[in-house]
Amino acid sequence: MKKIRILLWLSVLFLCSSVWSHGKVGSVAKDENLNGIINFPDVKGRLTLISDLHTHSVFSDGHVWPNIRVSEATRNGLDVLAITEHLEYQPHIAQIPHKDRNSAFLEANKAAKGSSLVVLAGSEITREMPPGHMNAIFLEDSNKLLNLDKKNQAEAQRRLKEQSFDVKGRDKNVVDFFALANVWPAEEAVAAANEQGAFVFWNHPMWSSQAKDGVARLTNMHKKFITDGKLHGIEIVNGSTYSEEAFRIAIENNLALIGTSDVHNLIEWDYLTRIGEHRPVTLIFAKDRSKESIKEALFQRRTVIWFKEILIGKEDNLLPLLESIISIESTGYDKGTQILTVIIKNNSSARLQLKNQSRFTFFDSTNLIDLPGNDKVKLRIKTLKKLDNLQLEFEVLNALIAPDKNSRIIVNTKI
């Protein structure tokens, strides 16, 4: 009887544990649904690393713990993640006080142990225009990018009255902290980041809160950063927004093209991965998976953005990627005809829209071909005479090498 009572108590304890416990500290329940995984093939001589270089957690104005960001990244198939908290804007500071601005990175790095995810240390320099918001990644110490001198409080309050920062409904302590931090010149914060060898990029230059017409424009401060070699990239894509003007700025000033989620809530809330949506990502073409190699690739501007169903990149980077994504194979001629069947395969998650620019026409398709991600299509081609080799040229309508210019690709196969 005593044994039965013990077993009953153990059963009750187990049940309570199941009811009250929601996973171990630092863990996230496993999701068996893999629909959100992003994949792109490597290019010749380099790895294609999938990254999100602008995200937030509760250590600034995000709403999840850093381990959630890590879990989301691994579920999406990301290789590289940066959690880039606002240095000057800290709306949760009363609830989550932390003096160390490296906290989010330390928590994320700990959560990523045992996975292949590379977590980069970074922060967001958060200022009024100019220069607006700028991310610095590969930092050694984020604290050195923040300067709070209480002697500047009177100046901070004076500036606060003049600036456009919206204080309505915001906690006064948070606003005062932001104002005081902004007295320290942005040039000093950017210089401090560069002293640590950071890769610095301009965030959401099209953001309507700082560019009322949504048009990205270089200010004199940005121009000087570029001239001095202190600004290395620019967001062409931020969340659901895209800037043609930022794309032009990048091309004209040799800045790396960056696309990010800038996620604050759950990724799944912003991008319904279960129905095929995805976060914007920056593809980085690196020699290996080390931080040193990733950093070298970014400084060499070897990036392509995947945004919605569009690939965006400079031609030197985008063409090799397309050559790895698209492959073609002949299955031979229909018996007694000059109609050739080929299989075109898409080796990536990106749906491609191809327009035929070759001298051949198709037997069962128009010149427009929809090539779904991770899939293949069959084409029947009227070659007019039997060939030993086939060459097709396509314009990729959703691959941009300039704001108004699509990429082209030539594919070959033996018959």
Residue ranges and their predicted role:
Residues 9-17:
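Bacterial N-terminal signal peptides
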Residues 2, 22-52, 66-70, 132-140, ...:
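Charged catalytic cores and adjacent phosphate/nucleic-acid-binding surfaces used
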Residues 1-8:
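Bacterial N-terminal signal peptides that target proteins for export
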Residues 123-126, 206-208, 263-264:
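Short glycine-enriched loops at secondary-structure junctions
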Residues 17-18, 109:
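Prokaryotic Sec-type signal peptides and long signal-anchor helices
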Residues 30, 34-199, 203, 236, ...:
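A metal-dependent hydrolase metal-coordination microenvironment
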Residues 187, 195-223:
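Noncatalytic carbohydrate-binding groove/subsite architecture in carbohydrate-active enzymes
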Residues 88-90, 209, 264-267:
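Short gly/pro/ser/thr-enriched loop/turn and capping motifs at secondary-structure boundaries
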